[in-house]
């Protein structure tokens, strides 16, 4: 993937606040197993809700392969908290307001589109911080969780 993170690349550690405002690091999640990081453009929009709810609905399948799910968007901590409460998410939503982490992963759009400046992409990351799979689909919201599970052997 040009200008971003691709399969086989090693991901740098990062820290962002979760929906409670607590700072969370990628390395913290990786200590417990592989991590599925999914980027979504904007909380509480139709597509992002469908994508995020599918990750929620597959909690048992992700647990069976020892993987954790982490959602990231440019929404504020407060908006992430409301999104999580409304849909009962059982995984953290990280707030990347300045788009720094999105840019590091290569999912930040070139055009300034506000909250929609982030591409909908998913990265499956092994405990060695190496990317095992990348999923990119703007239209098939279920593809992200489904393909991530396949990459993890689920």
Description of each model-found segment:
Residues 1-154:
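Chalcogenol-based redox active-site neighborhoods
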């Amino acid at each position: 993937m040009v200008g971003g993170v691709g399969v086989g690349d090693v991901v740098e550690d990062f820290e962002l606040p979760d929906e409670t405002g607590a700072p969370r690091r990628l390395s913290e999640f990786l200590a417990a197993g592989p991590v599925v990081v999914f980027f979504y453009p904007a909380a509480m929009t139709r597509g992002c809700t469908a994508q995020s709810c599918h990750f929620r609905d597959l909690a048992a399948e992700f647990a069976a392969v020892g993987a954790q799910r982490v959602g990231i968007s440019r929404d504020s901590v407060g908006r992430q908290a409301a999104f999580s409460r409304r849909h009962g998410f059982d995984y953290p939503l990280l707030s990347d307001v300045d788009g720094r982490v999105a840019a590091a992963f290569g999912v930040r759009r070139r055009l300034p589109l506000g909250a929609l400046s982030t591409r909908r992409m998913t990265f499956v990351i092994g405990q060695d911080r190496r990317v095992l799979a990348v999923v990119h689909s703007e239209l098939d919201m279920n593809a992200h969780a489904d393909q991530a599970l396949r990459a993890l052997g689920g």
